[in-house]
Amino acid sequence: MKTRRIMAVVLAALMMLSIIPVAFAEEISSISADAALSVRMDDAWAAIELAEAEALADNLPASDVINAVYTAALNNENVDADSFSDFTADGFFFTVNGMHCAYNYRLRNKIEANVTEEGSVTFNASNGKVVEMRDATSPNVLLVGPYYGGYDPTFTDQYRREATSIAEATGGTLTILAGHDATGPAIAAAFPDKGAVIYDSHGIASGTSSYLCLTTNQGITNEDYSNGWAVRSGNEAFIDGRYIENHITSALDNPFVWMAICEGMKLSGRGTTGYALLRAGCGAVYGYSQSVTFVGDYKFEETFWNVIKEEGTIAEAYATMVDVWGPVDPYGDAWPIVMSPVDDFPANPDQAQTVYCDWTLFGESEEPIALEGYTLSANEANIAVGETVTVKFNREPEDANLYDII
């Protein structure tokens, strides 16, 4: 009997061992396939970066460096031969086994690599101030600065000061994701519990979307690249609004997203980033139709945010900004564009826009006061073609606001 029991236990164990490979076969296969994609991606970029390094060592001009990189990519077996697109003076886009990639000479070779890492920081700017929020349900502010810390010295402290002043006005905290700490996952994780989000970075449009440029590809997956909501650029990466939409893990607080990046609202991008951010739970999104100048954007943002900090609406802030500086970058050809639930992506973003969004960051809520009665200055009017008639609507009480006029 003892022998039989032992044999039974052994047989059961063997049966369990035979089941284990079946249970994990699909998962192992998936991991192996993903690892294989990573190898192909890394091999392709190794060849591209070798060609770039050799061209730079020969002191070739930018156009020749780009051509050398293009030739290397074209001849690499891992690069999809028919995938090259969006050729510009700075580079081009392509795919590796369907995963989106980009080579941009300017971003790769005009950016300082040897800098003191700055990292991220969160601090309370409220000084004990308590403010009643309106459309944004959080007083906190997020500033994303991938090139902060010296990666690109053309980025100043303008948005540090602005973001700090917004947090001081709302009585909230300010979180700054700087340099390599501005990873895709970190940005998505920081979106919840924010009333205002500011991108201060480079931007680029490709295919049918517009992207925020990062100085690191840390945490971005092959799935992200395959879906096109992330683009690999060597050790760097770009992400669009769909990346945020698909990586946030909790509900957003209806924030306003200010994108101080180039091409965030470019026509070819079709508003993909803006629509994705709205679907994710943002209240409104601001960006530019073309490459914007630093000085032009700074003038726009200061005027715009001053109105917002005075409890104005986005429509009021936009109108004031345009009245002061005009409807286009005073030093370039970028048009400021707002997307919101009542402001669709324009058919032509390279022209003046009328903004209707009444989103307000904070301010005292209007107490609802019921309409008890009303009178009209005229009960009827005969109006001929081309004529107008004024009929006054007198409320009882005069400050009643709880009613609809149909």
Which ranges hold each PLM region?
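Sec-dependent signal peptide cleavage junction
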Residues: 19-30
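A domain-level signal for caspase-like cysteine endopeptidase catalytic cores
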Residues: 37-56, 64, 70-73, 119-210, ...
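Extracellular acidic loop/turn motifs
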Residues: 397-405
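Hydrophobic core
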Residues: 11, 15-19
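Short S/T/G/P-enriched beta-strand
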Residues: 366-398
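Cysteine protease catalytic core and zymogen-processing segment of caspase-like enzymes
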Residues: 205-287
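Active-site-proximal C-terminal subdomain of hydrolase catalytic domains
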Residues: 256-368
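Structured catalytic cores of large enzymes
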Residues: 75-142, 266
